[in-house]
Amino acid sequence: MACQCFLVGAGYVALAAVAYRILTIFSNILGPYVLLSPIDLKKRAGASWAVITGATDGIGKAYAFELARRGFNVFIVSRTQSKLDETKKEILEKYPNIEVRTAAYDFTNAAPSGYKNLLETLNKVEIGVLVNNVGLSYEYPDVLHKVDGGIERLANITTINTLPPTLLSAGILPQMVARKAGVIVNVGSSASANQMALWAVYSATKKYVSWLTAILRKEYEHQGITIQTIAPMMVATKMSKVKRTSFFTPDGATFAKSALNTVGNSSDTTGYITHQLQLEVMDLIPTFIRDKILTNMSVGTRAAALRKKEREAKAQ
């Protein structure tokens, strides 16, 4: 009898766990993308300026345009001043009623003095939104000792993917804390959700972004500051090397609009409904099967990249 009661109880617990998982999946997919209305971002930010790093290409540039569309002044940060000037011109042509400032910074420079100078420039304005977007990936997937670009590339990936969200957040948070308002968006990657073979350093550094952001949410949960992780899958950008959009692959502008609509409604999400759907489905697959699928995809990507590299070498 006791054994029977235990089995019945265990069955109810298992059923409750399955029901909770299903509800969580539907909540993650439908909540921020269908059911919940976007918040008043300007009110949540508490200030009129938005800082965006890596803002001259891809997702970062799209965030800059979308924030400008929503009436924010934008402070764009990237490595090359000429590209910053061109991006500034493009933004002002489309949104002439806002202000755009630029700051050139090479994020491979890990020196604290460099960050102090950059933060001194940025903190001259009241920053309501900080989008830590700048990032670096592999040229193509490979095992650690064969990564294209070698030690230098690995060092740059580690530096660029981890230091900016850490140090810029630390340097801009004081004014947000003083106002008890502000939004920080740390752009990671869905590569952080898995231990991805052939992407070791990229996957690991994006996991750092995810953990850092989650811990910052705990540290500042009573300060009126919204701190969000965005972990996209494939977006048609220069870094992803994907040119064509599809149902699962939005362009940067579509993605940025969707992602900003989730601020305040989800603290950790992919930023796009079909990305979230993919992530939730992948999460249901046993780890050993998921790892095999992802590794096979990466091996295929590497093979295609090496064939292209060989063709280009022969053409020279």
UniProtKB/Swiss-Prot annotation:
Its EC number is 1.1.1.330. GO terms for molecular function: long-chain-fatty-acyl-CoA reductase activity; testosterone dehydrogenase [NAD(P)+] activity; very-long-chain 3-oxoacyl-CoA reductase activity. Signal peptide: none annotated. It catalyses: a very-long-chain (3R)-3-hydroxyacyl-CoA + NADP(+) = a very-long-chain 3-oxoacyl-CoA + NADPH + H(+). One of its GO terms (cellular component) is apical cortex. The active site is at Y202 (proton acceptor). Pathway: Lipid metabolism; fatty acid biosynthesis. Substrate binds at S189. Gene3D superfamilies: NAD(P)-binding Rossmann-like Domain (3.40.50.720). Keywords: Fatty acid biosynthesis, Fatty acid metabolism, Lipid biosynthesis, Lipid metabolism, NADP, Oxidoreductase, Steroid biosynthesis. Disulfide bonds: none annotated. InterPro entries: NAD(P)-bd_dom_sf, Sc_DH/Rdtase_CS, SDR_fam. CDD domains: 17beta-HSD1_like_SDR_c (cd05356). NADP(+) binds at residues 52-80, 106, 206. It is an enzyme of class 1 (oxidoreductase). Belongs to the short-chain dehydrogenases/reductases (SDR) family. 17-beta-HSD 3 subfamily. This is Very-long-chain 3-oxooacyl-coA reductase let-767.
